[in-house]
From Swiss-Prot:
SUPFAM superfamilies: Nucleoside hydrolase (SSF53590). It catalyses: a pyrimidine ribonucleoside + H2O = a pyrimidine nucleobase + D-ribose. Belongs to the IUNH family. RihB subfamily. It is an enzyme of class 3 (hydrolase). Its EC number is 3.2.2.8. Keywords: Glycosidase, Hydrolase. One of its GO terms (biological process) is purine nucleoside catabolic process. The gene is rihB. CDD domains: nuc_hydro_IU_UC_XIUA. InterPro entries: Inosine/uridine_hydrolase_dom (IPR001910), IUNH (IPR023186), Ribo_hydro-like (IPR036452). Substrate binds at Q185, H197. The keyword Signal does not apply. This is Putative pyrimidine-specific ribonucleoside hydrolase RihB.
């Protein structure tokens, strides 16, 4: 997790995005830290070559920033975590008064089918299941973009070429990241393409109609064993418990890639 502020700073500097970057929890709240360097490389964002950093992270801890920002808000803030939920879970426990201040949480993580880090668990949830359990039991409205949805966004060499033609630093960054991803997908799984997981969350926020969801009761398994870190999704409602999550089911991939290209071209127009 320590590499994440550096990655965030690198991306912001390359794309000239003038927003503050905050460092958060260096470890999960209970378990030992795990990484997916076989997929994302040693830095967590291998592929692009970044210039030396000329900026640094803010001195305020990310958890404090989350709490302070939410407490000062009118309840109109949506959180979009695309990694382990450690920072949000700690913020919820430190200051429960933030819960009604959160409009919703649109997260990338979990699966109602097969995992990708274990047969049962998706990486982001498996990296800190106890934190995920705090979030999923918080009562805050949740939207889950899990593997069943995100794996439909298969990026191929043709998609990469399309974004390269769109041009600019954003197209270049997309190409560098996804060419590395395709390399590791082939090396690890023998696949010729790879999903673009995180962007589905932003796609949903821009146009929810592009993604079909189903209301489900979702519980995170924190028991030791082969299902540790699994998001148990009551797809058929057999438990009789109220739904706590909108779970992504299908995505209009033509719309999705069109939106990604629109964002790449939109970056060029604003810089």
């Amino acid at each position: 997790m320590a590499a994440l502020p550096i990655n965030g700073l690198n991306v912001c500097q390359k794309l000239e995005i003038n927003v503050p970057v905050y460092a958060g929890m260096p470890q999960p709240i209970m378990r030992q830290q795990i990484v997916a360097d076989n997929i994302h490389g040693e830095t967590g964002l291998d592929g692009p070559v970044f210039e030396p950093l000329t900026r640094q992270a803010e001195s305020t801890h990310a958890v404090k920033y989350i709490i302070d920002t939410l407490m000062a808000s009118d309840g109109d803030i949506t959180l979009v975590p695309v990694g382990p939920l450690s920072n949000i879970a700690v913020a919820m426990r430190m200051q429960p008064a933030i819960l009604p201040k959160i409009r919703e949480i649109v997260l990338m993580g979990g699966a109602y089918g097969t995992g990708n880090f274990t047969p049962s668990a998706e990486f982001n949830i498996f990296a800190d299941p106890e934190a995920a359990r705090v979030v999923f039991t918080s009562g805050v409205p949740l939207v889950m973009m899990g593997l069943d949805l995100t794996n439909q966004t298969v990026c191929t060499p043709d998609v990469i070429a399309r974004m390269e033609r769109a041009g600019g630093p954003a197209g270049e960054l997309f190409s560098d990241i996804m060419n590395f991803t395709l390399k590791t997908q082939f090396e690890n799984y023998g696949l010729a393409g790879g999903p673009v997981h995180d962007a589905t969350c932003i796609g949903y926020l821009i146009n929810p109609d592009g993604i079909k969801t189903q209301d489900m009761y979702v519980e995170v398994d924190v028991n030791s064993g082969p299902c540790y870190g699994r998001t148990v999704c009551d797809e058929l409602g057999v438990l009789g418990k109220p739904a706590n999550t909108k779970v992504g089911i299908t995505i209009d991939t033509d719309w999705f890639w069109g939106l990604v290209e629109e964002c790449v071209r939109g970056y060029i127009k604003t810089h």
